[in-house]
């Protein structure tokens, strides 16, 4: 009886050790984390956004940059600058601003419609966030954008979406001339 109990305890210990090792590998390896989040929560890309009909959730894990009147169903966190460049130039600059973040991948782009979509991951846990951008004409050789960054996982993002949006906007204002009114 004691030998059977010892075998059971030893087997349980080995199983718990294997589970702990697997958990460590899954949480410490970036590729494994991405796989784990996809397995638990589905594909990381949350899909396209129509800024004209956008309604934000009640959770604090989104950030919206939108010109006045373009997002009538949502309150923006910030207004974007108007750039003294044509929309295709701003479109290319948005791509470059996003690519400067090492954990960001472009998942969709339509130059004719002026839309881009990215999956950006947080540095430590690699939580996926979807960033949708629409580049808008704002007059002759002038353009602006709408940007919506939202988390797939969790209720709070500890400000990650807002920091990302501000970082991208800072890159754009450094790279492009801002229009004077």
Model-derived segments and their meaning:
Residues 2-12, 22-181:
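Ser/Thr-rich, low-complexity intrinsically disordered terminal regions
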